């Protein structure tokens, strides 16, 4: 019996191979064997830890910049330019932190797909995502040719 995949909008994509599950609850299929899925699971977990830490550090740096500005260490006159630099650095840190947190959400979704036995299959077509793509971006959700328009991490 196959698993029916659904598009993010809820429409059916078609049948995926029926997954099997190991004792840890990792789902694998004929296209993505247990060894590969475990390797990707471990890579996703490691990347999640790294990005969560990175997001926290960047937020801490942004808050520290605000605290330093409030303590009066920053000149806000036209000659110094320090105030503008601090604002730019703070905004950059917050933007990078938000990107890291967004990637963590995508990683969590990939980990969920592993537990459902649908990892490695396009959320758009249900076709297998090439292993090389998953090795490069373990949280990838679509095939390269399906990713039309826009720049993204998937």
Language model feature labels by segment:
Residues 1-113, 153-154:
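Interaction interfaces in information-processing and related assembly proteins
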Residues 112, 128-130, 151:
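Short functional micro-motifs and their immediate structural scaffolds
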Residues 119, 140:
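Residues immediately within or flanking Cys/His clusters that coordinate Zn2+
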Residues 130, 143-146:
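Zinc-coordinating Cys/His ligand positions in small cysteine/histidine-rich zinc-finger domains
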Residues 132-137:
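Short Cys/His-rich "knuckle" micro-motifs
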Residues 145-154:
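Short, charged, intrinsically disordered terminal tails
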